[in-house]
From Swiss-Prot:
Protein name (Swiss-Prot/TrEMBL): Small ribosomal subunit protein uS2
Domain of life (superkingdom): Bacteria
One Gene Ontology MF term: structural constituent of ribosome
UniProt keyword annotations, A-Z: Ribonucleoprotein, Ribosomal protein
Any Pfam family matching the protein: Ribosomal_S2
Length: 296
Protein backbone atom coordinates (compact mmCIF):
# COMPACT_ATOMS: atom_id res chain seq x y z
CA UNK A 1 0.00 0.00 0.00
CA UNK A 2 1.03 3.62 0.19
CA UNK A 3 3.85 3.09 2.67
CA UNK A 4 5.51 6.47 2.05
CA UNK A 5 3.01 8.08 4.42
CA UNK A 6 4.69 6.76 7.54
CA UNK A 7 2.47 8.67 9.94
CA UNK A 8 -0.37 6.46 8.73
CA UNK A 9 1.19 3.09 7.89
CA UNK A 10 4.32 1.07 8.55
CA UNK A 11 4.58 -2.71 8.19
CA UNK A 12 1.41 -4.80 8.61
CA UNK A 13 3.41 -8.03 8.78
CA UNK A 14 5.72 -6.75 11.52
CA UNK A 15 2.86 -5.39 13.61
CA UNK A 16 0.76 -8.54 13.35
CA UNK A 17 3.68 -10.86 14.13
CA UNK A 18 4.46 -8.82 17.24
CA UNK A 19 0.83 -9.03 18.37
CA UNK A 20 0.59 -12.73 17.77
CA UNK A 21 3.51 -13.38 20.10
CA UNK A 22 1.36 -11.82 22.82
CA UNK A 23 -1.86 -13.60 21.86
CA UNK A 24 -2.65 -16.48 19.55
CA UNK A 25 -6.17 -15.18 18.92
CA UNK A 26 -6.41 -13.63 15.44
CA UNK A 27 -8.55 -10.57 14.85
CA UNK A 28 -10.82 -12.80 12.79
CA UNK A 29 -10.40 -16.41 11.74
CA UNK A 30 -9.59 -17.43 8.18
CA UNK A 31 -12.69 -19.61 8.26
CA UNK A 32 -14.81 -16.52 8.89
CA UNK A 33 -13.07 -14.65 6.07
CA UNK A 34 -13.86 -17.60 3.80
CA UNK A 35 -17.47 -17.61 4.95
CA UNK A 36 -17.69 -13.90 4.15
CA UNK A 37 -16.33 -14.50 0.66
CA UNK A 38 -13.54 -12.00 1.34
CA UNK A 39 -11.20 -13.98 -0.93
CA UNK A 40 -13.26 -13.70 -4.12
CA UNK A 41 -11.84 -11.11 -6.56
CA UNK A 42 -12.93 -9.79 -9.94
CA UNK A 43 -12.62 -11.39 -13.36
CA UNK A 44 -9.00 -11.75 -14.39
CA UNK A 45 -9.29 -9.32 -17.30
CA UNK A 46 -10.33 -6.59 -14.85
CA UNK A 47 -7.34 -6.89 -12.54
CA UNK A 48 -4.96 -4.07 -11.58
CA UNK A 49 -1.23 -5.01 -11.71
CA UNK A 50 -0.53 -3.30 -8.38
CA UNK A 51 -2.76 -5.87 -6.67
CA UNK A 52 -0.53 -8.73 -7.81
CA UNK A 53 1.09 -9.29 -4.40
CA UNK A 54 -2.34 -9.88 -2.84
CA UNK A 55 -3.54 -12.43 -5.39
CA UNK A 56 -3.11 -16.20 -4.97
CA UNK A 57 -0.78 -17.28 -7.82
CA UNK A 58 -2.25 -20.75 -8.25
CA UNK A 59 -5.07 -21.14 -10.74
CA UNK A 60 -7.81 -22.15 -8.32
CA UNK A 61 -10.38 -20.41 -10.47
CA UNK A 62 -10.09 -20.08 -14.23
CA UNK A 63 -12.19 -16.93 -14.56
CA UNK A 64 -11.62 -14.85 -11.44
CA UNK A 65 -8.71 -13.89 -9.21
CA UNK A 66 -8.51 -15.18 -5.66
CA UNK A 67 -7.34 -12.85 -2.89
CA UNK A 68 -4.82 -14.23 -0.39
CA UNK A 69 -6.83 -14.30 2.85
CA UNK A 70 -3.65 -14.66 4.90
CA UNK A 71 -2.74 -11.15 3.77
CA UNK A 72 -6.32 -9.98 4.23
CA UNK A 73 -6.10 -11.13 7.84
CA UNK A 74 -2.75 -9.39 8.41
CA UNK A 75 -3.75 -6.11 6.81
CA UNK A 76 -7.08 -6.08 8.61
CA UNK A 77 -5.40 -6.57 11.97
CA UNK A 78 -2.95 -3.79 11.20
CA UNK A 79 -5.79 -1.49 10.12
CA UNK A 80 -7.63 -2.25 13.35
CA UNK A 81 -4.55 -1.29 15.41
CA UNK A 82 -4.11 1.86 13.34
CA UNK A 83 -7.74 2.96 13.75
CA UNK A 84 -7.63 2.20 17.47
CA UNK A 85 -4.55 4.38 17.96
CA UNK A 86 -6.04 7.24 15.95
CA UNK A 87 -9.39 7.03 17.75
CA UNK A 88 -7.62 7.08 21.12
CA UNK A 89 -6.10 10.41 20.09
CA UNK A 90 -9.53 11.86 19.39
CA UNK A 91 -9.33 11.63 15.60
CA UNK A 92 -12.70 11.94 13.84
CA UNK A 93 -13.88 9.44 11.20
CA UNK A 94 -16.29 9.34 8.28
CA UNK A 95 -17.56 6.03 6.88
CA UNK A 96 -18.37 6.01 3.17
CA UNK A 97 -20.21 3.29 1.25
CA UNK A 98 -22.89 4.24 -1.24
CA UNK A 99 -23.52 1.02 -3.12
CA UNK A 100 -26.34 -1.33 -2.16
CA UNK A 101 -24.16 -3.92 -0.41
CA UNK A 102 -22.55 -1.30 1.86
CA UNK A 103 -25.34 1.14 2.76
CA UNK A 104 -26.76 -0.54 5.85
CA UNK A 105 -23.40 -1.62 7.26
CA UNK A 106 -21.84 1.82 6.86
CA UNK A 107 -24.78 3.58 8.50
CA UNK A 108 -24.93 1.21 11.47
CA UNK A 109 -21.15 1.16 12.01
CA UNK A 110 -21.01 4.96 12.01
CA UNK A 111 -23.99 5.34 14.32
CA UNK A 112 -22.61 2.97 16.96
CA UNK A 113 -19.29 4.84 17.01
CA UNK A 114 -20.76 8.37 16.82
CA UNK A 115 -19.01 8.90 13.49
CA UNK A 116 -20.02 10.69 10.32
CA UNK A 117 -21.20 8.68 7.33
CA UNK A 118 -22.41 8.83 3.75
CA UNK A 119 -24.44 5.82 2.65
CA UNK A 120 -26.48 7.42 -0.11
CA UNK A 121 -25.31 9.55 -3.03
CA UNK A 122 -22.10 11.46 -2.34
CA UNK A 123 -22.90 15.15 -2.75
CA UNK A 124 -20.15 16.93 -4.64
CA UNK A 125 -18.42 19.40 -2.33
CA UNK A 126 -19.22 17.52 0.88
CA UNK A 127 -15.60 18.03 1.94
CA UNK A 128 -14.29 20.62 -0.52
CA UNK A 129 -17.23 23.04 -0.41
CA UNK A 130 -18.59 22.35 3.03
CA UNK A 131 -20.30 25.74 3.46
CA UNK A 132 -22.76 24.90 0.67
CA UNK A 133 -23.51 21.52 2.24
CA UNK A 134 -24.12 23.14 5.62
CA UNK A 135 -26.63 25.50 3.99
CA UNK A 136 -28.55 22.42 2.87
CA UNK A 137 -28.42 21.12 6.44
CA UNK A 138 -29.79 24.45 7.62
CA UNK A 139 -32.59 24.18 5.06
CA UNK A 140 -33.34 20.67 6.33
CA UNK A 141 -33.55 21.92 9.91
CA UNK A 142 -35.93 24.70 8.87
CA UNK A 143 -38.19 22.22 7.08
CA UNK A 144 -38.10 19.94 10.13
CA UNK A 145 -39.55 22.75 12.23
CA UNK A 146 -42.28 23.36 9.66
CA UNK A 147 -43.05 19.64 9.55
CA UNK A 148 -43.41 19.57 13.34
CA UNK A 149 -46.09 22.26 12.95
CA UNK A 150 -47.84 20.24 10.25
CA UNK A 151 -46.71 22.66 7.52
CA UNK A 152 -49.16 25.20 8.86
CA UNK A 153 -50.11 27.82 6.27
CA UNK A 154 -49.34 25.59 3.28
CA UNK A 155 -51.82 23.86 1.00
CA UNK A 156 -52.00 20.06 1.04
CA UNK A 157 -50.13 19.89 -2.28
CA UNK A 158 -47.41 22.28 -1.06
CA UNK A 159 -47.06 20.30 2.16
CA UNK A 160 -46.60 17.05 0.23
CA UNK A 161 -43.90 18.61 -1.94
CA UNK A 162 -42.11 20.04 1.11
CA UNK A 163 -42.26 16.67 2.87
CA UNK A 164 -40.82 14.97 -0.20
CA UNK A 165 -38.00 17.53 -0.27
CA UNK A 166 -37.39 17.02 3.45
CA UNK A 167 -37.25 13.24 3.10
CA UNK A 168 -34.64 13.57 0.35
CA UNK A 169 -32.55 15.95 2.44
CA UNK A 170 -32.62 13.56 5.39
CA UNK A 171 -31.64 10.67 3.14
CA UNK A 172 -28.55 12.48 1.87
CA UNK A 173 -27.57 14.57 4.89
CA UNK A 174 -28.42 12.67 8.08
CA UNK A 175 -24.94 11.16 8.26
CA UNK A 176 -23.15 14.52 8.03
CA UNK A 177 -25.64 16.93 9.60
CA UNK A 178 -23.52 17.16 12.77
CA UNK A 179 -20.25 17.81 10.93
CA UNK A 180 -18.77 20.85 12.65
CA UNK A 181 -15.31 20.29 11.18
CA UNK A 182 -13.86 18.06 8.51
CA UNK A 183 -13.19 14.45 9.51
CA UNK A 184 -9.55 13.41 9.76
CA UNK A 185 -9.89 9.83 8.50
CA UNK A 186 -12.16 8.30 5.85
CA UNK A 187 -13.07 4.61 5.88
CA UNK A 188 -14.33 3.67 2.41
CA UNK A 189 -15.77 0.41 1.06
CA UNK A 190 -15.23 0.80 -2.70
CA UNK A 191 -12.51 2.80 -4.46
CA UNK A 192 -14.39 2.85 -7.77
CA UNK A 193 -17.94 3.49 -6.58
CA UNK A 194 -16.85 6.24 -4.19
CA UNK A 195 -14.01 7.77 -6.18
CA UNK A 196 -15.38 11.32 -5.87
CA UNK A 197 -15.37 11.02 -2.08
CA UNK A 198 -11.77 9.80 -2.24
CA UNK A 199 -10.74 12.66 -4.54
CA UNK A 200 -12.23 15.21 -2.14
CA UNK A 201 -10.59 13.57 0.87
CA UNK A 202 -7.18 13.68 -0.82
CA UNK A 203 -7.63 17.37 -1.68
CA UNK A 204 -8.31 18.11 1.99
CA UNK A 205 -5.44 15.84 3.12
CA UNK A 206 -7.81 13.47 4.91
CA UNK A 207 -6.28 10.02 5.47
CA UNK A 208 -8.06 7.15 3.73
CA UNK A 209 -8.40 3.52 4.82
CA UNK A 210 -10.41 1.19 2.62
CA UNK A 211 -11.16 -2.17 1.07
CA UNK A 212 -9.13 -2.83 -2.08
CA UNK A 213 -10.38 -5.47 -4.51
CA UNK A 214 -8.35 -6.97 -7.37
CA UNK A 215 -9.57 -4.36 -9.88
CA UNK A 216 -8.20 -1.22 -8.16
CA UNK A 217 -4.92 0.60 -7.59
CA UNK A 218 -4.25 0.20 -3.84
CA UNK A 219 -1.80 3.11 -3.80
CA UNK A 220 -4.64 5.58 -4.42
CA UNK A 221 -5.41 5.52 -0.69
CA UNK A 222 -3.22 5.60 2.41
CA UNK A 223 -3.93 2.06 3.58
CA UNK A 224 -5.88 -0.70 1.88
CA UNK A 225 -7.23 -4.02 3.09
CA UNK A 226 -7.19 -6.60 0.26
CA UNK A 227 -10.65 -8.15 0.14
CA UNK A 228 -13.86 -8.58 -1.82
CA UNK A 229 -15.65 -5.22 -2.00
CA UNK A 230 -18.80 -6.58 -3.67
CA UNK A 231 -20.09 -9.05 -1.07
CA UNK A 232 -22.29 -7.60 1.68
CA UNK A 233 -20.84 -10.19 4.08
CA UNK A 234 -17.25 -9.20 3.32
CA UNK A 235 -18.05 -5.50 3.69
CA UNK A 236 -20.01 -6.15 6.87
CA UNK A 237 -17.15 -8.08 8.46
CA UNK A 238 -14.36 -5.65 7.58
CA UNK A 239 -16.21 -2.40 8.27
CA UNK A 240 -17.47 -3.63 11.62
CA UNK A 241 -14.02 -4.77 12.69
CA UNK A 242 -12.71 -1.27 11.97
CA UNK A 243 -15.71 0.19 13.80
CA UNK A 244 -14.85 -2.07 16.74
CA UNK A 245 -11.48 -0.34 16.97
CA UNK A 246 -13.23 3.01 17.45
CA UNK A 247 -15.84 1.52 19.77
CA UNK A 248 -13.13 0.04 21.98
CA UNK A 249 -11.71 3.50 22.73
CA UNK A 250 -15.24 4.60 23.67
CA UNK A 251 -15.62 1.78 26.17
CA UNK A 252 -18.15 -0.05 24.01
CA UNK A 253 -18.51 -3.76 23.33
CA UNK A 254 -16.59 -5.38 20.48
CA UNK A 255 -18.94 -7.01 17.96
CA UNK A 256 -16.59 -8.73 15.51
CA UNK A 257 -12.93 -8.13 16.40
CA UNK A 258 -11.26 -10.94 18.37
CA UNK A 259 -14.60 -12.71 18.80
CA UNK A 260 -15.27 -16.47 18.47
CA UNK A 261 -16.68 -17.47 15.10
CA UNK A 262 -20.03 -18.48 16.57
CA UNK A 263 -20.50 -14.95 17.94
CA UNK A 264 -20.08 -13.31 14.53
CA UNK A 265 -23.28 -13.18 12.48
CA UNK A 266 -22.45 -11.74 9.08
CA UNK A 267 -25.95 -11.27 7.69
CA UNK A 268 -29.37 -12.77 7.36
CA UNK A 269 -29.20 -15.18 4.41
CA UNK A 270 -32.78 -14.27 3.49
CA UNK A 271 -31.68 -10.69 2.87
CA UNK A 272 -29.22 -11.68 0.15
CA UNK A 273 -30.11 -10.58 -3.37
CA UNK A 274 -30.20 -13.06 -6.24
CA UNK A 275 -27.03 -11.62 -7.79
CA UNK A 276 -25.06 -12.18 -4.60
CA UNK A 277 -26.49 -15.66 -4.12
CA UNK A 278 -25.34 -16.56 -7.62
CA UNK A 279 -21.89 -15.15 -6.91
CA UNK A 280 -21.59 -17.21 -3.73
CA UNK A 281 -22.67 -20.41 -5.48
CA UNK A 282 -20.06 -19.78 -8.16
CA UNK A 283 -17.42 -19.28 -5.46
CA UNK A 284 -18.32 -22.40 -3.46
CA UNK A 285 -15.94 -24.78 -5.22
CA UNK A 286 -13.08 -22.30 -4.83
CA UNK A 287 -13.79 -21.98 -1.12
CA UNK A 288 -13.56 -25.76 -0.73
CA UNK A 289 -10.15 -25.81 -2.42
CA UNK A 290 -8.87 -22.95 -0.25
CA UNK A 291 -10.11 -24.69 2.89
CA UNK A 292 -8.35 -27.89 1.88
CA UNK A 293 -5.06 -26.03 1.28
CA UNK A 294 -5.31 -24.17 4.60
CA UNK A 295 -5.70 -27.44 6.49
CA UNK A 296 -2.64 -29.01 4.85
Amino acid sequence: MNTKKEEVVSSPEATVEKKQTQSQTPIVSRDKLLEAGAYFGHKKQMWHPKMKEFIVPKRLNKNAHIIDIVKTQKYLEFAYSLVEKLAAKGVSFIFVGTKRQAKKTVKEAAERTNSLYVSERWLGGTLTNNSVIMKRVQKMNELDKKAEQGFKGYTKKEALLLQKQLDKLHQNLDGIKNMRRLPQVMIVTDLVEDKIAIQEAKKKKIKIIGIVDTNVDPTVIDFGIPANDDSSKSINLIVNILADAIAKTQGKKQMYAYQPDDKIVLSNPHELKKSEEASEVKAASTKEKLTEEASQ
